[in-house]
């Protein structure tokens, strides 16, 4: 939910080591590591449909129904700037060099989130057992999932509201990430799960995302009973 969907933009996610590892420097370019990107696009333009002669002498044309990313003049400029790669033998289809030093500090979130990145329910249940081994909570969320959501949607010191706090995952992750938070829970797990979980967080709990965010403990929270459940 956003107050204004026209102006809200999600934050970028931190770049992972795997993402950066895709950048190499086979030609020892002084601008640093780079990766090749397709030099053709689907949005066809006759002005950008031109043959290219590779350094080896081979003539290559764009794939069917596609054209070059730039005009021929712009392509020549890229060649003069050593931004076009024809492979180590000079015989490959041209690609444009994308330098790591020129990309954004983060990455745009994909619409599909894999369990390797955001965890799964088994992770969440293990996290709950760390502070309550006797009372099972049926549907906990993994801390990595909430970390992804909070990273995309908020900034440090923002206020996060979870009106169905459950096992306290949102509050625990918000605390570790330097956000303020309000959690509402009518069930008894407010006492059996949320309170002990937050106490462990304050004590420096190293479960969940703690290592990833460098959590060492600290802070505090207030617990209120506002009335009998309706």
Where are the predicted features?
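Generic beta-strand/beta-sheet core signal
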Residues: 1-2, 116, 161-166, 184, ...
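Class I S-adenosyl-L-methionine
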Residues: 2-159, 191
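Charge-rich, low-complexity amphipathic helices
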Residues: 23, 97, 101, 196, ...
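Active-site lining segments that contact anionic ligands and/or coordinate catalytic metals
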Residues: 47-49, 110, 160, 167-170, ...
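Conserved S-adenosyl-L-methionine
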Residues: 139-211
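S-adenosyl-L-methionine
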Residues: 199-229
């Amino acid at each position: 939910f956003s107050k204004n969907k026209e102006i809200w933009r999600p934050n970028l996610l931190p770049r992972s080591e795997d993402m950066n590892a895709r950048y190499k420097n086979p030609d020892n370019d002084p601008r640093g590591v780079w990766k090749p990107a397709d030099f053709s696009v689907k949005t066809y333009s006759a002005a950008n449909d031109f043959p290219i002669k590779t350094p080896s002498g081979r003539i290559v044309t764009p794939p069917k129904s596609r054209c070059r990313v730039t005009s021929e003049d712009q392509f020549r400029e890229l060649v003069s700037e050593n931004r076009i790669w024809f492979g180590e033998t000079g015989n490959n289809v041209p690609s444009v060099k994308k330098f790591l030093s020129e990309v954004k500090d983060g990455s745009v979130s994909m619409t599909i989130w894999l369990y390797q990145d955001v965890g799964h329910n088994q992770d969440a249940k293990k996290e709950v057992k760390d502070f309550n081994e006797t009372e099972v909570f049926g549907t906990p969320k993994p801390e990595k999932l909430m970390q992804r959501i909070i990273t995309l949607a908020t900034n440090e010191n923002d206020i996060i509201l979870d009106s169905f706090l459950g096992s306290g995952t949102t509050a625990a992750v918000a605390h570790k990430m330097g956000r303020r938070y309000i959690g509402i829970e009518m069930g008894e797990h407010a006492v059996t799960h949320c309170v002990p979980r937050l106490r462990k967080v304050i004590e420096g709990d190293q479960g969940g995302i703690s290592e990833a965010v460098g959590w060492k403990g600290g802070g505090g929270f207030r617990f209120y009973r506002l009335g009998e459940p309706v």
